[in-house]
Amino acid sequence: MPDGVRGRTVLIAGATSSSGLAAAHALADAGALVIAVGRDAAKLDALAAAVPPARTAECDLGAEADVRALADTLRADGVRVDGILHLVGGWRGGGGLAGQSDADYRALEVGLTALRHVTRAFWDGLLASDAARCAIVSSTAVARPLAGGANYAAVKAAEEAWARAMAQGFAKDARDEAREVRAASVVFRVRALAGLETVLAERFTGLWDAEAAAINDTVVQIDAA
């Protein structure tokens, strides 16, 4: 049976939101080493004060060189990441299909770019872990996109595709090494994240309590109570 998240190192990408704080609390309370990453130094300081065990790192996750430098720094410190919670993103929309501007799309696309950068930079470590867990927060809009949110739904769909490709990569690595799957990539879908921060944190932390093969390449919808 899985041993849970205790003793694991988990990176929260885009950690300075309320969801990031909730995840940091849940992970630290469960015995994980938390690495909270974001761009806002003041908010990272506040998170560090609220969750004293957490390590923070200021990094522009949309800049590949910065993410590579962060990964190199952690490796030099002897840190191997066992999990990633991807929280980089936001909402822009409205105005029907004609109102889906390039400016809004580019702003939203940063979430996908950050996901690509972070998972590539830490991929080898995730494969080496005996219990890697990764998750993204997507949207129910992927299953039912609306004209006024087409940009948003398109980016979230791309993020889901990337997360599912990670799942296939984990499964392939296990086959190639002739061993059981020990890593999992999961998509959490929400209609709106506000009010579900604690639930998301608990669901993510709980991924280490499940067998990797049972949850890899799954889509989990989180609904309001």
Regions found by a protein language model. Name each.
Residues 51-65:
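Rossmann-fold cofactor-recognition segment
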Residues 1-12, 212-213:
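Flexible N-terminal pre-Rossmann segment of NAD(P)-dependent oxidoreductases
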Residues 30-46:
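Conserved glycine-rich Rossmann-like NAD(P)H-binding loop of the short-chain dehydrogenase/reductase
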Residues 96-99, 105-116, 127-179, 189-192:
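Catalytic loop of short-chain dehydrogenase/reductase
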Residues 62-77:
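Conserved Rossmann-fold cofactor-binding substructure of NAD(P)-dependent oxidoreductases
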Residues 85-94:
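Conserved NAD(P)H cofactor-binding loop of Rossmann-fold oxidoreductase domains
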Residues 16-18:
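Conserved glycine-rich cofactor-binding loop
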Residues 175-225:
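C-terminal helical subdomain
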